[in-house]
Amino acid sequence: KLQQELAHRVCDLTGMDGAFFANSGAEVNETAIKLARHYGHQRGVTNPSVIVMENAFHGRTLATLTATGNRRVQAGFEPLVSGFVRAPFNDLAAVEAIAEANHDVVAILVEPVQGEGGVSIPDPDYLPGLRDLCDRNNWLLMLDEVQTGNARTGTYLACQQAGVEPDVVTLAKGFGNGYPIGACLARGEAARVFGPGSHGSTFGGNPLGCAAALAVLDAIEQDALTDRA
């Protein structure tokens, strides 16, 4: 019951259609990467690739540290996972060039504001430009809002300030206010990619984690935290 309530509330806040709960930001970003690959295979792409950004940080699992743009995080864990194409952050032309040269791309994974990369804030047209590129190429736009989500920027999601709707969005950190819970949310076609048994998490969506996340949502609403960010 708590898991269902949390899914409904967070989807209402974000405009998403479905939720998968796990225990950390790395886990939900791993979920997003797996979803993108599954989406690619469903579209007949044999070796699906995800565009990621220089100086990004997405986690420390093998796939997410590969997606991370920091050699210090990756050092000693080679060989890294294939299936990623890297572009400079805040450079639409570079992503356009990848679109023209690489026909195995199925998604973009990007932070609306880079945190560990140095608090890099993109130009106002960057996220809308990525949304347009994804629409034109039938890619998924996947936003890592582990750092920026949960009312930290004046809206529940940072991308909402740019008027951008992602296909997939990930949440953690402030989502449970210190309790280990994360969410991978998806909408439209992306929400229908996984079927029964496609993915799982032993403790994902456990009652205590969901209760903590619901209490955080209550506090955000009752204390008008978006107005005070």
Go through the PLM ranges and name each one.
Residues 1-229:
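Conserved N-terminal phosphate-binding loop of PLP-dependent enzymes in the Aspartate aminotransferase
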